[in-house]
């Protein structure tokens, strides 16, 4: 979640830490950060969750987010938690955030009335949407 060797660039966590630490000196005019896209940011966090689990539980290493922290969505919940915590750190120094997410229309039929209606959905987990 921190560093991309291919592009030689810092990641989301390093960026947030830098802004929080140096807001008044390096980023005095920074007001808003745009996250494009939230679903991708959560995907980026998943390997970090696996790393965290394996560091805390060396006797029971996992390779999958679904197995991390005991399973039953605990790994996915941890990914969401660390992303949101970083976003709230930005907010704590006065930097707001705009989150972009991909949505798509889905046509459904009401089982009771038989009427067709359209709803918005996403590729993300409904827990995050």
What are the residue ranges of the model-derived segments?
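A solvent-exposed, charged loop/short amphipathic helix patch at secondary-structure junctions
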Residues: 45-78
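Phosphate-binding/switch region of NTP-binding enzymes
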Residues: 96-129
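Walker B catalytic acidic pair
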Residues: 37
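Catalytic-core regions built around general acid/base machinery
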Residues: 82-93
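Basic, amphipathic N-terminal segments that precede the first structured/catalytic domain
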Residues: 1-32
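Loop/turn-to-beta-strand initiation segments
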Residues: 27-32, 93-99
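Catalytic P-loop NTPase motifs of RecA-like helicase/translocase cores
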Residues: 41-42
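Well-ordered, non-membrane alpha-helical segments in soluble/globular domains
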Residues: 10-18, 73-84, 119-129
